[in-house]
From Swiss-Prot:
Catalytic reaction equation(s): [E2 ubiquitin-conjugating enzyme]-S-ubiquitinyl-L-cysteine + [acceptor protein]-L-cysteine = [E2 ubiquitin-conjugating enzyme]-L-cysteine + [acceptor protein]-S-ubiquitinyl-L-cysteine; S-ubiquitinyl-[E2 ubiquitin-conjugating enzyme]-L-cysteine + [acceptor protein]-L-lysine = [E2 ubiquitin-conjugating enzyme]-L-cysteine + N(6)-ubiquitinyl-[acceptor protein]-L-lysine
Protein location: Peroxisome membrane
Organism, scientific name: Danio rerio
Residues engaged in binding Zn(2+) 1: C252, C255, C272, C275
Name of protein: Peroxisome biogenesis factor 2
Source lineage: Eukaryota, Metazoa, Chordata, Craniata, Vertebrata
Subunit architecture: Component of the PEX2-PEX10-PEX12 retrotranslocation channel.
Amino acid sequence: MAGAGGDKPFAKAGPSPLSRVLRISQLDAFELDGALEQLVWSQFTQCFQHFKPGILTPVEPELKALLQLLLWRFTIYSNSATVGQSLLNIRYKNALIPGQKYRPMSRPQKFWFALLTVGEKWFRERSHSLFLNHPAESNARKARKVLSILLGLTKAASLVNFLLFLQRGTFPTLTERLLGVQPVFSRPQGPRDINFQYLNRELLWHGFAEFLIFLLPLINVWKLKAGVSALFSPLSDLTGTQSSEETHLTECAICGEWPTMPHSIGCKHVFCYYCVKSNVIADIYFTCPKCGAETGQIEPVRLQVGTELLQS
């Protein structure tokens, strides 16, 4: 009997579920919780986007507190963990009860947690308007001064608590330290498998992007486009019918549209001034993509209608 309950080796490897949570994991949980609150508030305000502007402004602190209480009800009150902590396999432990066994947060701790988080945020946002309508000589002025001193002391205490958290790795907020709740792992953590596949892929794509940034300016796009056009133009001439002279004069040999400020390079084809000028600037050996004629003097197209000579 004694041997059955004697010293027995641990069956599971890895740290205990009550082992210390990394500082970065605790801070990441706070970031996720803050992002969730902003997302819920933005979705809530979108429901009133077609109402009168500013309709939620008078009761905005109360509405935010109500939404935060709903989140508290289905996270801390139900599971002793926020949404961010649940995503990171973390939950709160009642550190006031000694021992290695996990103890969830007690009901008073949960209610005090809501009061010190949701209630503190609401009071900080609403405190300015609470004393705004009171005259300067009333007792509200003294109360506001005392309140500002208390808020300053609270911020100083939070700063000291955060410095202690950076040193010891426990109780990242003043509320957790006052209530005696500590983040622990929900399940035992196995050995961390480090995989550099994502990092290697990112480095590969960054290197490929830098290579393209260096290579693309060296490629003459205009010359490449003209070469492709000249490559396929003989095929179209063989399969199609012979183009008339009117077609040459009403269609740019480069873009295929109606010529804008028609110019020629010495052959029978007509070009837009921008098309031919940009190609000649990009490639001094530019040739006509239709007939392969070398570029001569770029001149406006001269048309003879009847007995009159018209210059485009």
